[in-house]
Amino acid sequence: MEEMMQFLRTRRTYRRFEQRPVDHAIAAEILEAARIASCGANRQTLKYVLVESPAMVAKMQPLVHWAAYLPPEQGCPAPDETPVLFIAVCQDESLPGANDTDAGLALGSMTAAAWAHGVGS
């Protein structure tokens, strides 16, 4: 239990990233962590899109507003500090039982798996 608590105490959220590629096998394991996350009634209403192509990542970057949470004095991440991949979590709201809680659980599992692989999220 102590190892788990230490893991949870040391995991951090990043808004500036090193420009090191993430191995596809690691990205696939992060996706698997989301896939096996708990969800209401096992409805599986979430879908995932892995974006690894540098060209597509560059197109997505301006659409992501997470850096807006930074205080103005910290500014937005520079071009050499942006993510090298994205995993989009999509909720199929046409399915019964779709809810934000399931997305939160999947995201929590993904961030834990990423951290376990030494990948900031």
Where are these regions (language model features)?
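N-terminal amphipathic, basic helical "cap/leader" segment at the start of enzyme domains
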Residues: 1-86
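Short helix-capping and hinge/turn segments at secondary-structure transitions, especially at repeat
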Residues: 62-65, 69, 92, 116-119
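Small-aliphatic-rich amphipathic alpha-helix that forms the alpha element of a beta-alpha
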Residues: 30, 34, 87, 93-121
